[in-house]
Regions:
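Immediate post-signal peptide segment of exported/extracytoplasmic ligand-binding proteins
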Residues: 23-35, 63-71, 163-172, 343
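Extracellular/periplasmic periplasmic-binding protein-like sensory domains
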Residues: 245-322, 397-404, 409-412
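Beta-alpha junction/loop-to-helix N-cap segments that form part of ligand/metal-binding clefts
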Residues: 30-32, 45-52, 59, 64-136, ...
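Venus flytrap/periplasmic-binding-protein-like
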Residues: 79, 124-125, 130-134, 209, ...
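Extracellular/periplasmic Venus flytrap/periplasmic-binding protein
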Residues: 84-85, 131-132, 140-248, 288-295
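Segments of small-molecule ligand-sensing domains
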Residues: 306-318, 329-394, 414-416
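Short, low-complexity disordered leader/linker segments with a strong preference
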Residues: 1-32, 406-416
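Periplasmic-binding protein-like
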Residues: 93-106, 124-126, 172-177, 224-235, ...
Length: 416
């Protein structure tokens, strides 16, 4: 009798457990990432290519069994590049149990910085956001994970110096920028380097929405007579700059754009490769389709009986999506390895980011080394050039003027 009662009790406990759903161990077989995106707002030309790249890399990882036995769940919310919607998206992601937020946009990064720190959830701002966030001691839960605007500005000066024979003394550099906080961000670096290298710096602001800059192009080419142009433009304005500088006869081989003016879409909107021939652009992810990870994604689609997505042809933005997802998942991998079988938190993923070193994804990712002190990972960019109508690699991964950047990061930290 006792035995049968014990069996009945055991079955009852099992039934209750089954009805109650999976326990913590089973539930934790999924790690949630909050993916903010813009597919319908002001920067949709980026989002509609970048976010599919992110999802495809997550699918590739999950198709191989996930990470340390856990599947990755990326929950995308389109915030239309509007800050209120971005804040709402964050709260929804937090309720879903996200241990990491993929931020999209400089104003969103600035709005979320304090919240992420209070909630101990890491957020990433690759190629945008606040440059001072490279300092992990002052911004513990913000990870640029790619070259900030300060680092991009420094590389722009180094590249101009190389292109102009190894010396900038007495040269004229034009800084053509979108007149908003992000556009103005590199100015302190450029001003410091002008004094250090002995070149003249003149700034040319382009008011939003950035679709008219004939006057600036004429001034750069015929009045100021710049020796080199560093451009930092967004949205439709990069293509306008290419067309206008070309129209006034300024050689595009003397122009280098920061990362948001260097996509296939910018070249197409300017009139195609023949118009943009010679134009240089910085990249924080590899460009082109010849990378092992992209071959794996194509193979995944083929196995499913599908054609690779059309977005893959826009290699600049699609590849950036792959890079962001890959760095995120590497941080999660490190967190899971440090806490096998346990429930990982945002703090664990933060620690996972700070252990990333030597992860290059076959060359698509630069040689990042993220630490508790350096959340940027080194400030690496490659420069590509339009040759024969296509983006072709012009430099290897590079960075510049670390002592100048360190000074500004330290000064910004002292004010925080």
């Amino acid at each position: 009798m006792r035995k049968s009662v014990a069996v009945m009790i055991g079955l009852l406990v099992l039934a209750v457990a089954t009805l109650a759903g999976p326990g913590p161990a089973a539930a934790q077989k999924e790690v949630v990432i909050g993916l903010q995106c813009d597919r319908t707002g002001a920067t949709q030309t980026v989002g509609v290519k970048l976010c599919p790249g992110y999802h495809d890399y997550v699918r590739l990882v999950n198709s191989k069994g996930g990470i340390e036995g856990y599947k990755i769940k990326a929950i995308e919310i389109d915030h239309e590049y509007k800050v209120p919607q971005g804040m709402e998206a964050y709260e929804r992601h937090k309720k879903e149990g996200a241990v990491l937020i993929s931020i999209y946009g400089t104003p969103h990064t600035q709005a979320l910085t304090q919240k992420l720190t209070e909630d101990r959830i890491p957020g990433t701002s690759p190629g945008f956001g606040t440059s001072a966030a490279a300092d992990g001691t002052k911004y513990p839960y913000i990870f640029p994970i790619a070259a900030t605007y300060w680092s991009q500005g420094a590389v722009g000066v180094k590249f101009a110096k190389a292109q102009l024979g190894g010396s900038l003394k007495g040269k004229k550099i034009a800084y053509l920028f979108y007149d908003n906080p992000a556009g103005r961000e590199p100015l302190p670096i450029l001003e410091d380097l002008a004094a250090q290298e002995g070149f003249q710096l003149k700034v040319f602001a382009v008011p939003p929405p950035g679709i008219e800059m004939g006057a600036q192009a004429l001034d750069i080419a015929q009045r100021y007579r710049a020796d080199f142009v560093i451009a930092h433009l967004f949205g439709r304005s990069p293509s306008v700059s290419i067309k206008e500088l070309k129209r006034v006869g300024f050689p595009l081989r003397k122009v280098v754009s920061m990362v948001w003016g260097a996509s296939e879409a910018d070249v197409e909107a300017a009139g195609g490769g023949a118009v943009a021939e010679g134009y240089y652009g910085m990249q924080f992810a590899g460009v082109g389709s010849d990378y092992p990870v992209l071959n794996e994604i194509r193979a995944m689609y083929k196995k499913e009986g599908k054609e690779p997505p059309a977005e893959m042809a826009s290699t600049v933005f699609y590849n950036r999506g792959v890079l962001i997802a890959a760095v995120h998942i590497e941080a999660i991998r490190n967190a899971l390895k440090a806490k096998p079988g346990g429930t990982i938190t945002g703090a664990d993923v933060k620690a996972g980011f700070e252990k990333i070193k030597g992860f290059t994804l076959g060359g698509l990712v630069p040689p990042l080394e993220i630490t508790a002190l350096d959340h940027e990972g080194g400030g690496w960019v490659q420069i590509f050039q339009i040759r024969g109508g296509k983006w072709m690699k012009a430099t290897e991964w590079d960075k510049a003027y670390p002592e100048v950047l360190a000074k500004h990061i330290k000064e910004a930290g002292a004010k925080k």
